[in-house]
Amino acid sequence: MKNCPKKSAYPKIGIMKRPHVLLTLFVIFISLTSYSQFRKYSNEFLNIGAGARGLSMGGAQVASVQDGTSGYWNPAGLVGVKNNPELNLMHAEYFAGIGKYDFASIAFPTTNNKRTFAITGLRFAVDDIMNTLFLVEPDGSINYNNIQAFSSADYAFIFSLAQKLKESGNKNIHLGVNAKVIHRSVGKFAKAWGFGLDAGIQIYQGKWKFGIAGRDITTTFNTWSFTFTEKEKEILYLTNNEIPVKSSELTAPRLVVGVARDFKISKKVNLLAEANVDLTFDGKRNTLISADPVSADPKLGLECNINNIFYVRAGINNFQKALADGDTLNIKKVWIYQPSAGAGFKISNVTIDYAFTNLANQSNPLFTHVFSLKLDMVGDKNKKKK
């Protein structure tokens, strides 16, 4: 870290006039921190996604997203929320209802539509986990009445600000930043608090759209604390379990680069194609391009827009190697991927989106149905104008 640029150099750079400088600074930072020790899968609930539109397009959203879900995908896209506040809601259940995932966001554009503020909330929880610490009585007998249930829940609260840097007839540049607070709890036993920053930029030129999102750009940290009664500590000690006191974990920076293009199919039909690449800097991962310290995970998405009323979407992501089915020797590996599809329907100021996603390999899939709602909160004056 001795070779990091001095802080005094930052104010001299015209960031508002040169958005690409943000990317340069971020790349320098992650190259210097990539050799630090991070937990590779820290805060994984933040990688599930937000909104059925994004999930049905395989998570390829960084370049094209322009609604209230941008606080999750790329905060720069929040400038697409104009004139009225926008509310987004989503609920999904995973693994036969064991895991429940909720997303909510509300975005507020300023009167001149140059800035947008947004608040986003995420929750992933698993309920009714059995606590069997006291299942066995001191005399060795089993007492099922001693089993108690608890929940494990992860929360994230994201505060976003987006601003238009440049708007002309052929080129638009938007910038956005996130500050996120993370809270995680495992029953009454463990709790964690964390904080992190994200930043993103979008550049629209003609039919082309470019996006870059830096997540956890300063490294996101979680600090854990643990609480056990004396009786619980005794049971843990007698069963040769370690009794944790305090711990902390860091989430390494992640860079998502995206490019999208609009295609005019007919007078009422448009096609949007987008490709994203997730770049991680915490060592070798099981991805399409796997290296140390940088791994790359591509995502592809398509959206067919019919008269701005009906939408059909498809996507593919999560390319990785897995053991082949039927290989009893566990030697042969094959490439698998995660497909997704979905649709959307817009009526006036209400949009309902649906996603059908696959959570496992093709031979033994686990499918999830996801619905989300987008509401443009049009005021009475605007309704009368319409």
Where are these regions (language model features)?
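Cleavable N-terminal export/targeting peptides
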Residues: M1-S42, V378-K386
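Subset of outer-membrane beta-barrel
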Residues: Q37-K386
